[in-house]
Amino acid sequence: MINSLLTRVFGSRNERQLRQLTRLVTQINALEPTIEKLSDAELQAKTPEFKQRLAAGESLDKILPEAFAVCREASRRVLGMRHYDVQLIGGMVLHLGKIAEMRTGEGKTLVATLPVYLNALQGEGVHVVTVNDYLARRDAAQMGKLYNWLGLSVGVVYPGMPHSDKREAYGSDITYGTNNEFGFDYLRDNMALSRADRYQRTLHYAIVDEVDSILIDEARTPLIISGPADESPELYIRVNRIVPQLTKQESEEGEGDFWVDEKGKQVHLSEAGMGHAEELLLQAGILENAEDGLYAAQNLSVVHHLNAALRAHAIYQRDVDYIVRDGEVVIVDEFTGRTLSGRRWSDGLHQAVEAKEGVPVQRENQTLASITFQNLFRMYKKLSGMTGTADTEAYEFQSIYGLEVVVIPTNRPTVRKDHPDQVFLNRKGKFNAVLADIEDCAKRGQPVLVGTTSIETSEMLSEHLRKAGVKHEVLNAKQHEREATIVANAGQPGAVTIATNMAGRGTDIVLGGSLESEYHALGEDATEDARFKIKTDWQRRHDAVKAAGGLHIIGTERHESRRIDNQLRGRAGRQGDPGSSRFYLSLEDNLMRIFASDWVQKAMRMMGMKEDDVIEDRLVSRQIEKAQRKVEAHNFDIRKNLLDFDDVNNDQRKVIYAQRDELLDAESVKDNVDGIRGDVIYDLVARFVPPNSVDEQWDVKGLEATLESELGVTLSLTDMVRTQEEIDAEQIAAKVQAAVDAHFAEKEAAVGNDTMRALEKHVMLTVLDQGWKEHLAKMDYLRQGIYLRGYAQKQPKQEYKKEAFELFSEMLENVKREVIHLLARVRIRSEEEVAELEEQERLHAQARLMASQFQHQDVGGYGTDEEAAQVQSGNAPLPVSQVTRDEPKVGRNDPCPCGSGKKYKHCHGQLS
């Protein structure tokens, strides 16, 4: 009550912020007459002037009004577009590091030019993040004209571009790219072995377009760079043959082998199912011993493969969750309907789906580097974003990213009419109504956009429309390449476009069709008459569509998130245009079936509803919204939980990547190596000669043997211990340290300082990367089983933090030991020695080849028909020549001349 009274008196926080920013808009507008009078050269000279003022200590906020006024005037001259006042407010919100919620068609791309220009003046780089490569290249090309005119450089990054081009793009004042590309390049940079191999500068400022899609919808999917693991994929194929023989239960208590938890996207074997699965696996020879049981320790890998196969068959559907293209399983984004080429599900799920579809099963991958979008974007010094739908997720943006959402008013009032939902008993009745609505719109010349939640539904609707003779376009993952063309024509009179979810998001649907696309098709050499004719035709179509009611949106199912539904609705009614929307639902829809209250379904059946009967009731709409809120809260908990765990990994990642940066930047890592060597020697001696112990507890011979095997240092300590009466552990440690230091000094003297420094750096980076890779695998295993600790009355998150710290400490110790072992055992040769060894190897290879020829002939001599063998081979016997040795014979126990350090008999002298 009090809050509502205060809001009425003082306005909401959003209104108060808008009032403050409106004062700045007044200042910018006051500067406009002065800025308009500047010549092109004078306007362009403002950029270096602003840079000088910033260098002199002036703040960005101080020059904001003038910089925004300059950018607005430059945009008017170069692009023919002048920023509205509400767009200036949007630009200020982005500059302040907040999220600007702006309705579809309000010109978010143009809004971004204001804060991008202002922040690029600092020269530290601005990243503009888009949801796909098409939008990144389009926006970089269109807005790049403005930035270049103002004296700023623009780059765009995309997969597969040459290394030098990508470095140049990241070195630009402004860089466009997708969230995936920025993330993967960050990981690649932290796997590079030299500064020259890195792309990115410090993460300074990012503006994320469609920020809700990237920071919320994709937050559950970590970016992973991986390499193939050693395990064969054969077991996935064998287990895949078992799963179709198991039967699905209708409920957890029903009869069958397994039941599906659709909320959690998991499959669980029943008691009977475990026994049946064991029996089938034994028959297939996958389980070896019937007495051990499916859940014995040695069969855990089989359980992992079986769970993956069950999920692949029972939960993941073709043309809904993935498509099969060119013999590969390609994931379909559940939020946008776009294909995610190059991405793979983890935990063996992708391999299980490949086995199910009968395409080649690729090896499981081992993680080399990974990061979540949550932790990637939180590393930017300043982060902001823009979208048409953020207010429903304002709490999550604030709590996880520290980003406040500011709702920007529209330039013109929205006149779209949102009709109430229509609820049917089953899918058949629902789709009959959808088809009737589409046909009605097509007859009246009203364009209609139909949003579906799967490729399967879009193709089913397409088939019905084809039979009814209704011309239409389908926009889903299978028509990804034609996306821009289809969206450009979606506003034509009577056009029918079926789209999966938000495919085509980022491109406006203009009533009457895209005038820009028609101009582009004419070419630059088109006459004024031709352009005038096109403009006249477009205006006629535009007016006809407005008269028919504008763009009509049909939703065939409610999404789990209200935000996705709002995005679909937001495609209509842009810039004050007319439009309408309606959602058609059925009790068989996933949201209604899984999350809506049972009483809704019972009530509709008790009322004797038939297939084509419809309900339009606020009570039902409230229940649907309640179900959506439940799912949103559930998904938020999942993302928050993921972040809690990844924060542990992130702290460790920061330590490792900071260490790598130090190594890459250092001219020499000798001091690091010396320090590590001291630690390793101390630990090594302490294993055999514990501190503060008596000599009866010492294992001196063990220490000598370990020094020889691990460090290549021969040192006699036994005599010293026997002959010296008063000797302690510290003296032994000092003796060992001196011997190892001398061993390293000897190596350095032999090869020179420069070579040794380069080797030390290379070994430290390589061992650190290998250790981190193995540590990530251990962390994955720890994460997968950590929830079992809950059964022991322990907090899984606390246990994870504790054990992750122990694993990390262990990894760092292992890295230290491995660095010293490698540097101690490595043998570096001069160029002359390498050339000599290569010549020796050539001679040895030639001798082995001749020996094998002689052996073959000798063996042939013992055959029953030597002449027949010669006729079949087509060769006469080779003359046996005397082989003379230029060098002393290499004994089988001598070191191999190749320099491997192995005995000759275990290297190039192995018996075949």
UniProtKB/Swiss-Prot annotation:
ATP binds at Q87, G105, E106, G107, K108, T109, D508. Gene3D superfamilies: Helical scaffold and wing domains of SecA, P-loop containing nucleotide triphosphate hydrolases, SecA, preprotein cross-linking domain. It comes from the Bacteria. It catalyses: ATP + H2O + cellular proteinSide 1 = ADP + phosphate + cellular proteinSide 2. It holds the Pfam family SecA_SW. May bind 1 zinc ion per subunit. Zn(2+) binds at C896, C898, C907, H908. The keyword Translocase applies. Keywords: ATP-binding, Cell inner membrane, Cell membrane, Cytoplasm, Membrane, Metal-binding, Nucleotide-binding, Protein transport, Translocase, Translocation, Transport, Zinc. It is an enzyme of class 7 (translocase). GO terms for biological process: intracellular protein transmembrane transport; protein import; protein targeting; protein transport by the Sec complex. Residues 865-912 are annotated as: Disordered. It is found in: Cell inner membrane; Cytoplasm. It is a peripheral membrane protein. InterPro entries: Helicase_ATP-bd, Helicase_C-like, P-loop_NTPase, SEC_C_motif, SecA, SecA_CS, SecA_DEAD, SecA_motor_DEAD. Its EC number is 7.4.2.8. One of its GO terms (cellular component) is plasma membrane. The keyword Metal-binding applies. Its main location: membrane. NCBIfam families: PRK12904.1, secA. Belongs to the SecA family. Monomer and homodimer. Part of the essential Sec protein translocation apparatus which comprises SecA, SecYEG and auxiliary proteins SecDF-YajC and YidC. Part of the Sec protein translocase complex. Interacts with the SecYEG preprotein conducting channel. Has a central role in coupling the hydrolysis of ATP to the transfer of proteins into and across the cell membrane, serving both as a receptor for the preprotein-SecB complex and as an ATP-driven molecular motor driving the stepwise translocation of polypeptide chains across the membrane. This is Protein translocase subunit SecA. It comes from Xanthomonas oryzae pv. oryzae (strain PXO99A). The gene is secA.
